[in-house]
């Protein structure tokens, strides 16, 4: 019950607090007004705003759920997907999943909706796109995926597992799909299958690491393919 209530609360907070212009308006007239203006209206690129988004999702995807696990439930984070071990057949499954996903991502990158959405990073000052800013963004982006995988495949799946069993995977998949609603439709539909698959891996092996590596790999390839498609 706590996990489900927190899911509604946490996703709501992310939706509103990630809005950089709203944050800038809220901070106007305070001693941190310049910070709000920087994250919302940086003249060089939108990396400050993306960094703010990653900070918000990390707080609500990882920091607060981890606090609930440790302080409220008095449980071990390793029982919620953070086991430091590699699952049996890890590399084989990673290779198979990559062979399936990368061609699909490439085909999606050829569509207008995909090209309009990715990459999230936008550069306004004429700096070459392939450079330090892109590297910084990808590293920040990967932090976001750690929080996301921990929240959905760790916190949600394993907190619901004792009462719902295998159905915890499908309950988790509903909000996971919904966070993709602003993205191209093929990606949102794919999130259903991905949510079930990655949820099953965590349910079976007690680890989020394969899902995290796959997510980071796909996200990086999406950005590169999108840049290639744009020329």
What do these predicted regions represent?
Residues 1-37:
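N-terminal entry module detector
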Residues 14-18, 67-78, 201-204:
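Structural signal for the C-terminal ends of transmembrane alpha-helices
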Residues 22-55, 71-144, 231:
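Juxtamembrane helix-loop-helix connectors linking adjacent transmembrane helices
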Residues 1-4, 47-50, 165:
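Membrane-interface helix-boundary signature
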Residues 1-12, 62-66, 93-105, 171, ...:
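Alpha-helical transmembrane segments
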Residues 55-76, 143-162:
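Transmembrane alpha-helical segments in integral membrane proteins
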Residues 100-231:
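Transmembrane helix-loop-helix hairpins at the membrane interface
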């Amino acid at each position: 019950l706590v996990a489900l209530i927190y899911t509604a609360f946490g996703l709501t907070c992310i939706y509103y607090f990630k809005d950089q212009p709203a944050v800038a308006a809220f901070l106007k007239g305070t001693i941190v007004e310049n910070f709000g203006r920087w994250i919302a209206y940086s003249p060089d690129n939108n990396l400050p705003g993306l960094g703010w988004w990653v900070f918000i999702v990390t707080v609500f995807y990882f920091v607060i759920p981890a606090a609930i696990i440790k302080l409220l439930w008095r449980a071990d984070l390793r029982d919620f997907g953070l086991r430091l071990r590699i699952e049996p057949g890890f590399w084989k499954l990673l290779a198979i999943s990559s062979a399936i996903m990368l061609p699909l991502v490439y085909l999606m990158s050829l569509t207008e909706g995909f090209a309009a959405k990715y990459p999230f990073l936008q550069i306004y000052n004429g700096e070459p796109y392939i450079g330090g800013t892109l590297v910084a963004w990808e590293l920040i982006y990967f932090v976001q995926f750690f929080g996301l995988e921990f929240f959905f495949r760790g916190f949600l799946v394993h907190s619901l597992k004792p009462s719902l069993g295998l159905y915890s995977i499908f309950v988790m998949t509903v909000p996971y799909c919904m966070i993709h609603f602003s993205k191209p439709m093929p990606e949102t539909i794919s999130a259903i299958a991905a949510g079930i698959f990655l949820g099953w891996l965590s349910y079976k092996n007690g680890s989020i690491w394969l899902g995290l590596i796959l997510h980071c790999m796909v996200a990086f390839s999406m950005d590169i393919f999108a840049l290639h498609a744009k020329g």
